[in-house]
Each structure stands twice: as structure tokens, then as C-alpha cells.
Amino acid sequence: MCIRDSFFFGDLASGGALVRGGKLKAFIPGGVSAPWFGPDQLDVPLGQDEVANQASMLGSGSIVVFDEATCPVRAAWRITKFFSRESCGQCTPCREGSGWLERIMYRLEHGGGRIEDIDLLLDLCDNISPGLLWPPQQTTICVLGPSIPSSIHSAIKMFRDEFVAHATNDGCTYA
């Protein structure tokens, strides 16, 4: 069975729309700690090895879906905010890195961002999880730290133009 055939995607298998009527923009195959997938990856088989071969993971087993009305910058900021709050503070990369990432994402989302913030985010992500490899390199006591960069890195990789628009248009352009 591939991801497209999972119950969550409803009639996407026949080219239909998501439940709210929008078209698929992106999805996360294994909860918010996993790298994002695009619509072209709906036919990836729903198995640990197959998803790992596409540089992601099934993780918690939840599939997070974004339709065309979803702002990827806002989604990545909210996920980063969650991870920042979950950090126990014991490890420096997680404690310092998650807070810094959250503040930069907040700036981009709320109108204070700069174009340089995009590359700064990627640099910080690389410092938390060196090389941004999958599976992530362990730089902290637990796996929370190396999971934090996944959403930001994926969102920038897939939707860099939307990050640029946030940095140059005083924040989010979505309603």
C-alpha cells in the first residue's frame, strides 16, 4: 500500500480533492519530527524502509496534511514553537537552537523577517543536526534536538519562494 492509498487521503487516489476541497500542497508522513513530502511522493510505499529511502520516516505514524491554503512558513513556525516548548533544556543545541529558530521563524511570520533569515535558519539547522542528513545525526542526549530542523529545512527546500515573500512583504500573505 502506498501513501496515496491510505484512508487519510480519501479520493486523492482518483485525482480528487482533500476533505476541505483544496488541493494537496505537502504532507508529513510520520508526524511533525519527520521531513516533509510533496504531492509527487504520494506513491511512496507506506513502509519504514521505503519512506526512509525518500529521506523521511514514519515516526509516530501520523500523517500531517497541508492543502494549498496552508502557509508553509506558519506551519513550520508552529512546529518549531512546539519543539522549543518541549525542550528540557539539558542539551545546548536543543535548548539554544530551538529558541533561536523559533524567534527567527516568528519574525518571518509576523513581519520582522529579513531575507538573510532564510540562510540563517538553514545554518542554525545545520548546527543542530550537522549536514541535515537523514537520518539525523545525534547531537543531543535524546532525539528531540535533531528532529527540530526537519520542518524548517523541508519547508525552505520546498517553498523557498514563500519564505522570500514573507521576508520581503512584511510577513504572512495568507489570510
Task: Go through the PLM ranges and name each one.
Residues 4-175:
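Redox cofactor-anchoring modules in respiratory/redox and cofactor-processing assemblies
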